[in-house]
Amino acid sequence: MKTKEFHFNLPYSLIAQYPSEKRGSSRLMVLDPKLQKIYHENSVNNILKYINSDTFIVFNNSKVRKSRMYAESEMGSNVEFLILDRIGTDLFTALISKSKKQIVGNVYKFPEGLMGKILSKNSSEIVLKFNDDVREDYFEKHGFVPIPPYIKRDYDKIDEDRYQTIYSKYVGSAASATAGLHFSRDLFSAFEKNNIEYDFITLHVGLGTFLPVRSKKVEEHNMHFETFLIKDCVANRLENAKFLGKKVLSIGTTTLRALESSYDNKLKKFKTGQQSTNLFIYPGKNYCFKFVDMLFTNFHTPQSTLLMLVSAFAGKDFVFSSYEEGINKGYKFFSYGDAMLVLNHI
């Protein structure tokens, strides 16, 4: 399948540059792939019209690290880093600006005199070794929220709150699991009032989620691994919900990939503990969804693995028709944009 089949044209005015006025106030497009119907809601809070006590919701509670860092090269120029994965107390994978000019052995001066050296480098990332242990509070103090490059404005303090979900707990993501940004405390209270169960897994968002597909053919894309955690107690609740016939609603593509990666459909059991996945789901792969029944997600960038996953879940033609309708109706796209609820998969 050709990657360009997942391209679409989007007016720049529909790329959300700021979050909605308050969580839950974004618009919601609802897709029913089986009936080929599209519904429109003026608020994400109206998700309650489509779920009930027979639904079990799963969220990704990874927390976004302030992973955008700035340092000075030995030549005195400013260099930008995006810290990806922690692989040791002083060792991280990262992206680096002007990558072609940066070579193994280069040393950079970070805030407070911390020094970082490129240990190794490949086509997509570097391994960065610091001269001292780096705790998370260092990034909290000196780093910046890694808002995506299509948000073309100056850094704003509002991002420190709104680019993070209200339930984020475990630091490790280099980008937000943006589907969760829509959920407010009031909405969680409504879930509880309506006896709608929910729980959390943890997948740290990295290159596997946000690296675009650059190969001409979808099948040739190299999907990067991302680490995730499913606790025993969470797995037990999920398995029991499925046994009772409840519909599992995944909040976001990251949650879906974690659940689908670790569920054994024959044993009807999850593998628990810390794991990693490079699961790449796209139309034409004939992937059979094992555990997730419903998907809540955002409107994604062209030619992204996220758009491909949603297309496999709901049907490519139907998804692209819904995107076209969304554009015509002025829906906002990408991280701070409006939301989509897919009621079932094909």
From Swiss-Prot:
EC id: 2.4.99.17
Q: Name one GO cellular component term.
A: cytoplasm
| Any single biological process term in GO | tRNA wobble guanine modification
Q: In which pathway does it act?
A: tRNA modification; tRNA-queuosine biosynthesis
Note the SUPFAM superfamilies from the entry.
QueA-like
Q: Name one Pfam family in it.
A: Queuosine_synth
Q: Which domain of life is it from?
A: Bacteria
Entry's localization field: Cytoplasm
| Keyword check for Cytoplasm | yes
- Tell me how this protein assembles: Monomer.
Against NCBIfam families, the record matches this protein to: PRK00147.1, queA
Could you say which protein family the record assigns here? Belongs to the QueA family.
Q: What is the official name of this protein in its record?
A: S-adenosylmethionine:tRNA ribosyltransferase-isomerase
Origin organism is Borreliella afzelii (strain PKo) (Borrelia afzelii)
Q: What is the lineage of its organism?
A: Bacteria, Pseudomonadati, Spirochaetota, Spirochaetia, Spirochaetales
